[in-house]
């Protein structure tokens, strides 16, 4: 079984709860902001903890270090989707994540000119699936085309600058929306009254 959040990107949710369930993989959905509750779901069949560092679209922020420490006590690897927070602003490896997945179509590409994804295995767990991974890469392909790699390299050159401008614009917009009377709630972690603000820092 896989333990993960109730709040996930739609395609990830579908993969875990529909596609993988056909192959006998149970997905245990829970509130990843409650580490004790997550730990109670761990059993002998738990193969990994999957998390989004900041959930999409709810924008819940999880305590990555606390979750990885708990998972590692039980010998469980942690896979983290860090797409929504660029790696220039966040280091999953330093917080104990074992495998990081990133949709490079988003921030890295930058100009919506290419599709791509990254899987970064930090080599902390002797995954029994290495043989299966090699077979999958052989059958499905493991490399970007040169054109896609080139387009994404161009995006990398401006990633940090683009992210800083986007973050400043998002904060300014969130603050402005807070002043408009018809709007009753603004869910943005950059706002100091957001319940995840301190954790997101």
Predicted regions and their residues:
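Conserved PLP-enzyme active-site core in the AAT-like
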Residues: 1-182, 187, 192-193, 198
């Amino acid at each position: 079984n896989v333990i993960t959040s109730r709040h996930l990107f739609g395609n990830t949710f579908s993969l875990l709860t529909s596609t993988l369930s056909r192959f006998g993989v149970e997905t245990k959905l829970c509130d990843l902001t409650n580490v004790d509750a997550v730990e109670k779901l761990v059993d002998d069949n738990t193969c990994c903890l999957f998390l989004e560092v900041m959930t999409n679209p709810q924008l819940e922020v999880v305590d990555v270090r606390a979750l990885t420490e708990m998972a590692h006590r039980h010998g469980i690897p942690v896979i983290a989707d860090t797409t929504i927070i660029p790696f220039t602003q966040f280091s999953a490896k330093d917080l104990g994540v074992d495998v990081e997945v990133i949709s490079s179509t988003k921030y890295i590409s930058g100009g919506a000119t290419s599709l791509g994804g990254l899987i970064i295995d930090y080599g902390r767990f002797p995954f029994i699936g290495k043989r299966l991974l090699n077979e999958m890469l052989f059958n499905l392909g493991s490399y970007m085309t040169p054109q896609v790699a080139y387009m994404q390299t161009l995006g990398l050159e401006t990633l940090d600058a683009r992210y800083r401008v986007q973050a400043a614009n998002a904060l300014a917009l969130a603050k402005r929306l807070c002043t408009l009377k018809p709007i009753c709630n603004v869910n943005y972690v950059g706002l100091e009254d957001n319940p995840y603000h301190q954790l997101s820092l």
